[in-house]
């Protein structure tokens, strides 16, 4: 089974995953998540946690087309992005302050000697329509708790606020969506 962890950063999911990120980490197999060096229809699973928001709406369409190209028919794409709707509800209801959601909404990460920021944000409807428009199907939310890899590796698909980091009492602020080719 060919499994890609795209935009993985320092997170190493183990030897049975291929890790791709522009960063400089010893476990990386490749650098470019926008131009994958794989044959058409050769990948079973793509996982990308809090990475597509770093592309603008035109760039992300090209990236998702590239990812779809390498997925096998029936292959699964799992994406996690900051959940605009969840954070907006928390803020509107006075559960969090603006300072609590600025980071997850706008991002800020050093990359290649400069700081990069999120270029867009998503709610379920906008992410659904984006994926549907690019011929992905069986689009639905997923619960990170249902997958061993996510239970064993703490990543942004498990981002919670109110209280921050509390997976039992907090509100999930990661929009976790899966789709199939």
Task: Show which residues each predicted segment covers.
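Conserved class I S-adenosyl-L-methionine
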Residues: 2-9
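Anionic group-transfer/hydrolysis microenvironments
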Residues: 7, 23, 82
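Adenosine-cofactor binding site in Rossmann-like domains, unifying the SAM/SAH pocket
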Residues: 10-40, 143-144, 149-164
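GHKL-family ATP-binding catalytic core of two-component histidine kinases
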Residues: 37-39, 56, 123
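Local beta-strand N-terminus motif with an aromatic residue
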Residues: 43-44
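A conserved beta-strand element that flanks and buttresses the S-adenosyl-L-methionine
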Residues: 47
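Short catalytic micro-motifs in class I SAM-dependent methyltransferases
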Residues: 50-54
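S-adenosyl-L-methionine-dependent methyltransferase catalytic module, highlighting the catalytic core
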Residues: 59-66, 70-72, 76-180
């Amino acid at each position: 089974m060919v499994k890609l962890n795209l935009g993985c950063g320092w997170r190493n999911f183990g030897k049975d995953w291929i890790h791709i990120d522009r960063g400089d980490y010893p476990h990386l197999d490749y650098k470019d998540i926008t131009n994958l060096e794989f044959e058409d229809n050769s990948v079973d699973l793509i996982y990308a946690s809090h990475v597509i928001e770093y592309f603008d709406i035109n760039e992300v369409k090209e990236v998702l087309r590239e990812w779809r190209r390498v997925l096998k028919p029936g292959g699964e794409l799992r994406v996690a992005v900051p959940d605009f709707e969840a954070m907006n509800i928390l803020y509107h209801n006075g559960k969090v302050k603006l300072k609590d959601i600025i980071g997850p909404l706008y991002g800020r990460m050093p990359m290649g000697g400069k700081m990069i920021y999120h270029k867009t944000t998503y709610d379920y409807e906008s992410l659904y329509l984006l994926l549907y428009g690019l011929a992905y199907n069986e689009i639905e939310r997923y619960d990170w708790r249902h997958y061993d890899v996510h239970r064993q590796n703490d990543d942004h698909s498990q981002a919670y606020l109110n209280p921050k980091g509390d997976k039992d009492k907090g509100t999930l602020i990661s929009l976790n969506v899966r789709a199939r080719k």
